[in-house]
A protein has these predicted regions:
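A juxtamembrane structural motif centered on a specific transmembrane helix
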Residues: 1-6, 48-51, 248-267, 368, ...
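Interfacial loop-to-transmembrane-helix boundary motif in multi-pass membrane proteins
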Residues: 57-65, 97, 105-147
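A membrane-periplasm/extracellular boundary helix in multi-pass inner-membrane enzymes
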Residues: 135, 238-293, 315-317
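Transmembrane alpha-helices of multi-pass inner-membrane enzymes
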Residues: 186-191, 231-237, 375-384, 391-425
């Protein structure tokens, strides 16, 4: 029982960072991510003091901080040069540090409870809270009492969501949900294909594959951005298992057979629900509108992609191309497209600086953990694909990899079988 409480506590900490929210009873207060970041910073300083070797900052944290400071300065210059008061990204260094330290409590608790932090363990908790978000989304959408209960805990713009008739999960919705779901789907595929210990445990593989399908289906009902991660996750799964070459790796034969069987079962269930439930017919039609349009009209299009095609906005003078207009918030340019909003805010200088930081993260982790090379390459691709629709970034997933100890990093690379806690390298 005590172990279950510990695991649930870690899940709450992971959810509070990855799917952060404001409390309904403290709307003007800090969100859960900020609270955890403060707690994480204090815990990090305590661990550094207890280690007796001073403050040991992870190399990737230092590198990310440098990029964040540079990006903040560029945005500050854009605001000052254009004489605006839109400081949306001018304090990005603060955003970076909040993200980085908000996961520290969860990582430390994983180390305390399980003995060491591994990529599969991070995946288990992220998958768990993501499935929780998806299930609560369906419950909220079908049971007003459940939605009222959620609203008593989490502050959301309820009237807005009701006006657009979209599913709200426990603490995330729309494109922010779709991006986060996509990142978790890629992580599932990478862990299933890469970690030999996971592959040996058929029960864990079974649960991960079921979770993959659930997140894909319900996630697309919440936000069709999820389809990006779903498609990329499938490509990663098929590629890494060598299914594409019709010579499936021996250790992946049973995994792919299980996945194929689950796809058949869930597809059959989907067909039944589509034909017997008006609610699920509407949600599935929305979730997979592109596929329905392809089979019915011969074109893979959705209403949202057609709207996005009308949203391309670019600078109209050299100054804006170089340093931007200093305007980001307020939907001033009438576009959601990430590339447009970022370039219009601080020009190509700002955009290149911002994009370079995510190239750095992918490069750093791909070199540090070569077994997971393809995961980080796909995360890099995801960074630039997401900006075709929204301007959010994917820092929230990278920060979970910031805090491995040297021994844990060796274990991830298959060098040592066990890890002992020490300060992060």
């Amino acid at each position: 029982m005590w172990k279950l409480i510990q695991i649930l506590t870690i899940a709450v900490l992971v959810n509070g960072s990855y799917y952060s929210f404001n409390f309904a009873f403290w709307v003007s207060g800090p969100n859960t991510k900020m609270i955890l970041a403060l707690f994480g910073l204090l815990w990090f300083l305590y661990d550094s003091w207890r280690g007796g070797r001073g403050i040991s900052i992870p190399h990737v944290l230092l590198g990310g901080a440098i990029f964040s400071i540079l990006y903040s300065l560029v945005n500050l210059v854009a605001v000052e040069v254009n004489n605006t008061d839109d400081y949306s990204y001018a304090n990005y260094i603060t955003t970076f540090l909040v993200w980085a330290f908000s996961v520290y409590p969860a990582i430390r608790c994983i180390r305390i409870v399980h003995g060491e932090v591994t990529i599969p363990r991070i995946a288990y908790y992220l998958v768990g809270v993501t499935v929780f978000q998806c299930i609560t989304g369906l419950l909220n959408d079908n049971f007003p009492a459940m939605q009222s209960f959620t609203d008593s805990i989490v502050f959301t713009a309820g009237e807005f969501y009701e006006s657009i008739d979209r599913i709200r999960c426990f603490s995330v919705a729309l494109d922010p949900a779709g991006v986060r779901f996509s990142l978790v789907l890629l992580l599932i595929s990478a862990v299933v294909c890469t970690d030999t210990e996971v592959q040996k445990n058929r029960w864990i593989v079974f649960l991960l594959l079921i979770s993959y399908i659930l997140i894909s289906v319900i996630g697309n009902m919440v936000a069709r951005t999820t389809s990006t991660g779903m498609a990329m996750g499938l490509v990663l799964l098929l590629f890494r298992s060598n299914t594409i070459g019709f010579r499936i790796r021996k250790e992946m034969v049973q995994t792919m057979a299980t996945f194929s069987l689950l796809l058949v079962v869930f597809s059959a269930a989907g067909v039944i629900l589509y034909n017997t439930s008006e609610y699920f017919r509407g949600e599935l039609s929305f979730a997979f509108e592109g596929f329905f349009n392809y089979f019915n009209k011969g074109e893979f299009t959705t209403g949202s992609t057609e709207v996005l095609q009308t949203m391309w906005r670019w600078p109209e003078d050299n100054k804006t191309w170089i340093i931007g207009s200093g305007w980001y918030g307020g939907f001033i340019y009438g576009t959601d497209i990430g590339y447009c909003r970022l370039i219009l805010y601080s020009g190509l200088i700002g955009f290149v600086t911002f994009a370079s930081s995510f190239v750095y993260y992918a490069y750093y982790f791909a070199r540090k953990y070569p077994r997971y090379l393809w995961l980080f390459l796909f995360y890099l691709a995801m960074t630039f694909i997401v900006w075709l629709k929204v301007s959010t970034d994917i820092l929230m997933i990278y920060v979970f990899f910031f805090w491995f100890t040297a021994e844990e990093s060796d274990h991830i690379n298959g060098i040592f079988p066990e890890a002992t806690p020490e300060l992060c390298e």
